[in-house]
């Protein structure tokens, strides 16, 4: 698999994926994206993993987006395939049943920000800079940026963001709802792991169904969304974890969930 992507499982239920090309600002090469896809697919079918953290090596860059040194050598038809590779990777990340936290350790630009947008939650260091600068290169965001960003921060803000290609600081990103938390660099991973641990402590079937209901519900009208919510709720009723939650409440102890 090479070392462009690092993958570890921490504390049994927490997966950590690290983009590991610091010499290239963790830019997304084709090899790196294929490796990332393999890891995402491995996580998808591992019911023991309850939460995922995605971060980058170093303090300068989370991910600079597409590898432009690689891109400049491509023919026109190859460029589209290169963009599609990033888009498919982001889609796989978005579709994971487990919640994914982007721990943005530095600049997140272009396809790098689009990967973060495919995550459920985003935490950024104070020094991070975020942007979709593609229009400045006479192209557009092609890995979900034009679709996920307006769903997250609203149509008007997303249009300004993409049309101008301007970059925002971590604090401004928090103000507009692009990230949930901003930390000092030394606190980034502790905060991400704290959040992942809080998620992992809850009923894993319930968390997966909550993610499913939220994501699918946002794609449709309210009435259909409420029906999706009810179907998701039904999945939790016959579980042993639901009974464990009630028993733990009655006995005034912390519930121990097993995902069954």
Swiss-Prot record:
Coiled coil: none annotated. One of its GO terms (molecular function) is lyase activity. It comes from the Bacteria. Pfam families: ECH_1 (PF00378). Keywords: Lyase. PROSITE patterns: ENOYL_COA_HYDRATASE. GO terms for biological process: fatty acid beta-oxidation. Belongs to the enoyl-CoA hydratase/isomerase family. This is Putative enoyl-CoA hydratase/isomerase YngF. The gene is yngF.
């Amino acid at each position: 698999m090479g070392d462009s992507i690092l993958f570890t499982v921490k504390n049994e239920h927490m997966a950590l994926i690290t983009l590991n090309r610091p010499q290239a600002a963790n830019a997304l090469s084709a090899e790196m994206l294929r490796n990332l896809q393999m890891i995402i697919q491995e996580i998808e079918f591992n019911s023991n993993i309850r939460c995922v953290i995605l971060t980058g090596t170093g303090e300068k860059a989370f991910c600079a987006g597409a590898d432009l040194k690689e891109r400049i050598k491509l023919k026109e038809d190859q460029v589209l395939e290169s963009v599609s590779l990033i888009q498919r990777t982001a889609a796989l990340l978005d579709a994971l049943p487990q919640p994914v936290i982007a721990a943005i350790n530095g600049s997140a630009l272009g396809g790098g920000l689009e990967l973060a947008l495919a995550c459920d939650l985003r935490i950024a260091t104070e020094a991070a800079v975020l942007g979709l600068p593609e229009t400045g290169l006479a192209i557009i965001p092609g890995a979900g940026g034009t679709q996920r960003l307006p769903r997250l921060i609203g149509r008007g803000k997303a249009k300004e963001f993409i049309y101008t290609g301007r970059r925002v600081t971590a604090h401004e990103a928090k103000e507009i709802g692009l990230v949930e938390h901003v930390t000092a660099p030394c606190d980034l991973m502790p905060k991400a792991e704290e959040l992942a641990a809080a998620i992992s402590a809850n009923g894993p079937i319930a968390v997966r169904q909550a993610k499913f209901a939220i994501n699918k519900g946002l794609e449709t009208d309210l009435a259909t969304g409420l029906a999706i919510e009810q179907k998701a709720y039904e999945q939790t009723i016959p579980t042993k974890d639901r009974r464990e939650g009630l028993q733990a409440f009655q006995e005034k102890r912390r519930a121990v969930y097993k995902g069954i």
